[in-house]
UniProtKB/Swiss-Prot annotation:
Physiological role: A P subtype restriction enzyme that recognizes the double-stranded sequence 5'-CTCGAG-3'; the cleavage site is unknown.
UniProt gene name: ydiS
Disulphides: none
Name of the protein in its database record: Type II restriction enzyme BsuMI component YdiS
UniProt keywords, alphabetically: Endonuclease, Hydrolase, Nuclease, Restriction system
Keyword Repeat: no
Domain of life: Bacteria
Self-association state and partner proteins as the record states: BsuMI restriction activity requires YdiR, YdiS and YdjA.
Keyword Lipid biosynthesis: no
Expression induction: Constitutively expressed during exponential growth. Encoded in an operon with ydiR and ydjA.
Lineage: Bacteria, Bacillati, Bacillota, Bacilli, Bacillales
Length: 343
């Protein structure tokens, strides 16, 4: 059975919406595989977004974003066979419409077909191979929240790039992927990542639930550490509302972070410190967010594995919240009155 001409025309019109693609080269010195890492709230995603804008422009067709999470799989990232709804005319004519047909489906019989559905990696790969003079980027947020080596699977070998930015070693995918590539105009028997295919990611070492990247996997990436205070000036005017010894107080967000970070430096890894964007500006006046996000992070993520550090005046999180809501100082040190400001 063949897809109708109406559907084909619709898909063609959607393809044309990508507009005129920018055609320019990127310096070889800019890494094709890149991981930005740093403490929570340092602005890794913001930094990556700025870098993407400077290098790749603002055409949404050239970049794709995906977030890894526990349980994220090869099939989701690369692609897999899935049930796909299609529609047949009730008139009995052998005319089939795909699920991409967006008009109202009246007088059509729904059917289920099984097709290879590409993941974000294959989508970007096809774009890059068919538009060699345009740069494409796949952004992976939180790459170490999933088992990255398992998610990448057989494309792991493609991450080895030569000085021109192309894969050193080609691979042959399974028949389902190779057939899909062929149907989309990619008929090579062996596949390499072209130099115009960039893969950039963010990584947070400090969070619980993240998985370590093995040495062989890390070797294929360029790592860039984002300094804790790189975007300090961006939050200079932010103020934090908190209860201190039974009174509602206001303190500059950067001053509060300095108080916390200075007492933690040298006692915990640097990626456990508070970055400028650990809290959003809109969250700084929300007491529930302060308690359940910032205090919880300090108690459960920072001090749970460092119980000997003299910092919080509570042995459990519930005790910490009770003291915060009451009139006690939750810290084992005093905050100087001169640190507080008017709201």
């Amino acid at each position: 059975m063949e897809i109708s001409k109406q559907t084909s025309d619709l898909l063609l019109s959607l393809e044309k919406k990508k507009g005129t693609l920018p055609k320019f080269s990127v310096l070889r010195s800019i890494p094709r595989n890149r991981i930005i890492y740093g403490a929570p709230g340092t602005g890794k995603s913001n930094y990556l977004e700025r870098e993407v804008g400077k290098i790749f422009g603002d055409n949404p067709y050239v970049f794709t974003r995906v977030t890894f999470f526990p349980g994220y799989t090869y099939g989701q990232f690369i692609g897999a066979y899935k049930p796909v709804p299609i529609y047949k005319k009730l008139s009995g004519e052998e005319e089939i419409f795909s699920s991409n047909f967006r008009d109202k489906m009246e007088n059509f019989e729904p059917m289920i077909d099984y097709q290879f559905v590409p993941g974000p990696f294959i989508d970007v790969l096809i774009k890059a191979l068919k538009n060699r003079y345009t740069n494409f980027i796949l952004i992976i947020e939180e790459i170490n929240r999933a088992n990255a080596a398992s998610v990448f699977g057989d494309i792991f070998q493609l991450l080895d790039r030569n000085k021109n930015g192309e894969s050193d070693y080609p691979v042959t995918f399974g028949p389902d992927i190779m057939n899909y590539l062929a149907r989309n105009g990619i008929k090579d028997e062996m596949i390499k990542l072209p130099s115009n295919f960039f893969i950039w990611a963010t990584m947070n070492n400090a969070d619980q639930g993240v998985l370590p990247l093995d040495t062989a996997f890390k070797r294929r990436w360029s790592f860039e550490y984002l300094e804790l205070e790189k975007y300090r000036k961006a939050v200079d005017s932010w103020k934090l509302s908190l209860r201190y010894k039974g009174h509602n107080k206001v303190i500059m967000w950067n001053d509060f972070r300095d108080i916390i970070n200075k007492r933690l430096k040298g006692k915990v890894p640097e990626d456990k410190l508070l970055g400028p964007f650990f809290l959003k500006e809109s969250e700084l006046w929300n007491q529930n967010v302060f308690k359940n996000k910032l205090l919880y992070y300090l108690k459960e993520d920072v001090f749970k594995h460092n119980p000997t550090i003299d910092f919080l005046n509570a042995s459990t999180f519930s005790e910490l919240i009770e003291k915060y809501d009451g009139s006690d100082n939750i810290f084992t040190f005093d905050i100087d009155d001169s640190s507080f400001v008017s709201d």
